[in-house]
Design a protein with these regions (language model features):
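Active-site cofactor/cluster-binding pocket
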Residues: 1-148
Length: 148
């Protein structure tokens, strides 16, 4: 299944990481792709770190587990860079997309010497300008789709 793309999302409860993964799954499904989109969280409260996942392929997906070696990682809240190893298992050929006002070079020191591509997007600004309200998952999905 060499056409499989695996994505891991990091966010906090209530920030839309789960919703973003499901929106991306819907969009991929509507283009004829095979998809999976699912969250991983326990009884944590709003604001606790959560993880969500996507698999997208042109072939049927027979894997049914969490994603341990993603092609892409999306970080919805840059404060998680101090709390979670978002680079764990990330392929060197992959990329990280971080919702932040900081530039990628400033953040690389928090990414455990990850040498792959790091992209930043100010999802709040994009969302406010385009939609008049803050929807971090919509602008993060759009940016991710543009680099995948």
């Amino acid at each position: 299944m060499n056409n499989l793309i695996e994505i891991r999302w990091h966010g906090r409860g209530g920030q839309g990481a789960k919703t973003a993964s499901l929106l991306l799954a819907d969009a991929a499904f509507n283009t004829g792709k095979y998809i999976q989109g699912f969250p991983e969280y326990g009884p944590e409260r709003m604001g606790a770190p959560i993880t969500a996942y996507n698999r997208i392929s042109t072939s049927p997906i027979t894997i049914h587990s969490n994603i341990y070696e993603p092609d892409y990682v999306v970080v919805v809240d840059d404060t998680l860079l101090d709390a979670v190893d978002v680079t764990a298992g990330l392929k060197e050929s992959g990329a990280i997309v971080i919702n932040t006002t900081k530039d990628a070079e400033h953040l690389k020191s928090k990414l455990n010497n990850y040498n792959g591509s790091v992209y930043t997007i100010d999802a709040r600004k994009v969302s406010m300008e385009a939609l008049g309200k803050y929807f971090p998952n919509v602008s993060s999905d759009t940016f991710l789709a543009s680099i995948v």
